């Protein structure tokens, strides 16, 4: 397959072609996140609390898979742009091997540690039981998640975005269908409650992997994963982790933030923990589609950067910025005007709806300005500048928001914690813009 279309095709139709499949798949994934939570919420509010508490660990596992996949994607795209097909194959093969290793370690570690982790945030026996039941099943599929993300990023690196889209949608749709069947025991399916929700998730992930394997072997691509490429290459492996670790941290930092917020707010009322969990489900409807556009941008930036087309890289970045800005503006308007309805989808508790509605209106004030941070972070990853991307995420998820949340909570009460979000977005966006401007002005030709 000839990937030169990435530096020859007009930018708007090119980015649209690359991004649209990922936006669609991310929207379906967002729908799954919402529907999955809605079904769990129908079990009980304790079940919803358990899901909210397990979410940071799930998010960390996904962060390792996606973040390391970003490293694989960036290196493959760069070497294809530089006409170094052999190195692209080595990057894909080494990435696949390390991803499986990550999956084994995370499966064992997460199952062993989840009871202790949950007990730090709640003493409610029902919440603990539901959380452990869910986690013990869903974490078994960590290896499959790692393999899925490797194939997804390999397909994306050669412009086969439709394959990624179909694979993601297949898993999400299967999950949506299986959720009510396995949770509530409809028809001949057993009533499994939280275990059913976890099993539905795992089956969906397995179906995605099966599809990727069929696509890889039936319609070969220019990048190959093979044992013959499993050769010692310390420089390449260091580059994989040099890009992958910052990307992993970028994605894992929200887990630390959520855990911090849960610990801070649980001392006041359980409804605040539920609100944080609901918000992070709702915001996927904005940030996942925006991430879909960024996924379409990233291989284009990497390929053109490797080919020395710096002006084209700038145009791709600025167009992505505008497209994500439209998504965030729409999201801000919807969340501000319909917050009671959105929170009410997950709970009928009047206190939770009131607290959640107020929180959502406050947080959404930072959506539009966050466009700069998320787009710059994704572009820097595509440019193999993982360290600078990590700086943006550290500011956004740790260095600004955690001190702000703590001070606001202690000074004005838990309801004021949510102001830390929009203040953080403004501060981070200013620094992200400067980092991106510097990177585009001073391109690094080494990889």
Residue ranges and their predicted role:
Residues 1-19, 76-143, 189-245, 301-366, ...:
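Short alpha-helical transmembrane segments in multi-pass integral membrane proteins
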Residues 8, 12-31, 35, 57-64, ...:
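Residue-level signal for short hydrophobic patches within transmembrane helices
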Residues 17-36, 137, 171, 204-208, ...:
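Transmembrane helical elements of multi-pass membrane transporters/channels
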Residues 27, 31-49, 118-125, 181-192, ...:
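Helix-terminus/linker motif at the lipid-water interface of multi-pass membrane proteins
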Residues 48-108, 145-164, 262, 275-339, ...:
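Small-residue-rich hydrophobic transmembrane alpha-helices
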Residues 60-63, 107, 175-180, 209-213, ...:
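Hydrophobic transmembrane alpha-helices of multi-pass small-molecule transporters
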Residues 69, 73, 138-156, 164-172, ...:
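Short runs within selected transmembrane alpha-helices of multi-pass transporters and secretion channels
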Residues 110, 153, 179, 183, ...:
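Structural signal for membrane-spanning alpha-helices in multi-pass inner-membrane proteins
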